[in-house]
Amino acid sequence: MGFDRDSLNYAAVIGSGMGGVFFGSREPTFWIINAISQASPLPVITSFFLLYALLGVSFKTAAIVKLSPKPLLSIYFYMTLYFVAHEFTQIRTGVAAGIYLFALHSLSRGARGEFLLRLLAATCFHYSAVVGLVMFLVPGATRARLRLFALPIIGIGLGQILTAENFEAVGTYLLPGPIQGRLFLYLELLSDERFSQINLLNPVTTSFLVLYWILVLKIPSTARIYDRYLLSSFGIGIASYYACSMIP
């Protein structure tokens, strides 16, 4: 507790009840894990974070062992880059990301129905996983390095063009209720000066950008379709980060 602001927000929500609009503000699995935590002999908050951490670590470890050609190296990068962020702070994202790794593998095998089911499971842990549908538009066997290299640049360009009104229109007409509510909440935070001072070219995001470009240049022509999907997903994630930079 107190590791970051998210943990304090979760503590305020846990045990506050279910129903109405407040229930829709979180995914179904959030309330299921909350209910299990209430019945646990351990302190509620301890059980809550422990259950999410166990799920996140289990899904990602299973995906690494099954899908990575170099599992030890993959586990090293997971522990150094994502473990704290996913299993200590962004706990819902952490579980959804683990399931998403399996979903992409389904898509790489051409099993689109299985991909949708697994993506639905990921969305039940974090609504934002629904954006994974964009991977349907990505040719699995693409070798267009220039196109992949340009993704972050396109995102940066869009970030200079898009306005709060654009995002509000998308939220109003295209997004389902729960995701729409979160978007509008973030748009309201634009009035907070703390968020206007965020440096998009901070060392962490810049290091991810540089790493992505290195991978684009170095990926072999014989790389697995699954690896190409992972790289494309990485690039789309970075592009989305820059394109939506005006949202806190």
Task: Show which residues each predicted segment covers.
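Alpha-helical transmembrane segments and terminal signal-anchor/GPI-anchor hydrophobic tails
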Residues: 10-11, 28-31, 142-248
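Membrane-interface alpha helices of multi-pass inner-membrane proteins
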Residues: 83, 114-138
